[in-house]
């Protein structure tokens, strides 16, 4: 590896660290769309819902295109059945956001109950 390339790689890493440390804002966050896969998987298990087909081998949501995304979204949100579920989801999303450096969030939700 050349010295120039090494410097470029190090500069990019430094830039990423700098940017990741900046405070962030979410100006249009859909609560259900931001649901962590692990949260939805756990909630579905509590409710005895089998939505395992929406996750890939690493536990992430699995979809190929927008239409697939809509099917996954529908299955994932089927686990959100009560105000308490939304309370727990809100906490999970805000914790994840805070860990990413989000200091302000305008969050929208669309409960279906």
Predicted regions and their residues:
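Metal-cofactor-binding active-site regions of metalloenzymes
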Residues: 2-113
